Amino acid sequence: MGKKKKRKGTGAQLLSIVVYLLIGAASGLLIVRFIDNFTGPDVTIGQEILIFALLMLSVYAAMLLQIIIHEGGHLVFGLATGYKFSSFRILSWMFVRENGKLRFRHLSLAGTGGQCLMAPPDLKDGAMPFLLYNFGGSIMNLCSCLLFGGLSLLFPRESFFNFFFLVLVLVGAGFALLNGVPLHLGQVDNDGANALSLLRSREAVRAFWIQMKVNEQTSRGMRLSEMPEDWFVLPDEGAMNNGITAYIGVLASSRLMDQGRFEEADAMMEKLLSGESRIPGLHRGLMICERIFLEVVGKNRPEALESFLTGEQKKFMKAMRTFPSVLRTEYALALLTDKDPAKAEKILKEFDRYAAKYPYPSEIAAERELLKLAEKQAEE
């Protein structure tokens, strides 16, 4: 089973690489065509380099615009089917509804270019609308392709606008494909994979609803330990093969951490990580961080830490180096394992800097309690 899932993940990642290569190649051909129209005796090499740089920036701008269009699609179709706005993120820039007000915050998640999270409508007989919300981004990307393709026809081939609109078509089509076709892409499942999981399981629909409700309550300042207990009941092993349902295990272990029930949390995380659960790579990496932290403030065994801190985990922690729980884990390692107070103090300052911009104050409050736990261990 593990090898089968790995093959699926590898195939999905290969497809994403191929799609991005095709987008890059097609954009490159458009760039060459555009530059050829400006070559001549009066154009210097410096001017050609400048034009090339501006065109490359235009490709990046097209990708950014299509991310906005994609997340906007989730927002529009979510609102149309009874969801309410919770947060809207592009790259690390994020708008979040906080106590009824819209706030600007920063959040960076490896493997994601953006994210639109919404508060779900109430469940009715265990059901809720989810297809349009999940596919809304890809639908909007495809609609934009039609719009930009039509606009490109209004300008001559040598025009910058013709170039830019055609790049928008290429990027939009690529995004629609990579998000609409069910794929397990490295750290997270894409929209199509989520929709397929929901179609296959009624239990997954409830799990999806719980995830959205947890996010809604977190944005209102509530901690996991304060939320209804029945939201965090661990699904049976069969249900853990569904990526959305398996995420309830992540929430359940995080709630145990928030309650200070560390031994139970560690035992649950060990079980989840060693089993056949379909927990996405992003959350697996964060869960290993939690186990590292508990080991450091507990027995602090070198052999146990070595087993956790694999090359893959170190790479993950580097990619997620601004995330609060990762910084907290790095702080504990510096303070208690490396015995390096200066390094720990530097990490703590980084934590404070990123915490000030973090969208969920209740999570930062929980993180600070765990930081104090590490400090207390250092004093003993």
Across the structure, where does each feature detected by a protein language model lie?
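Topogenic membrane-insertion module of multi-pass membrane proteins
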Residues: 2-59, 109
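Membrane-embedded alpha-helical segments that form the functional core of polytopic membrane enzymes
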Residues: 48-68, 162-177
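Small-residue-rich helix-interface/hinge motifs
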Residues: 58-122
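Polar-ligand-bearing catalytic/cofactor-coordination segments
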Residues: 80, 115-124, 183-264, 270-276, ...
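Hydrophobic transmembrane alpha-helical segments that form the core helix bundle
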Residues: 122-219
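Alpha-helical linker/edge segments of TPR/alpha-solenoid repeat scaffolds
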Residues: 224, 292-306, 332-343, 370-380
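Alpha-helical repeat scaffolds
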Residues: 226-237, 262-275, 300-316, 340-354, ...
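Alpha-helical adaptor scaffolds
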Residues: 254, 258-260, 279-323, 327-328, ...
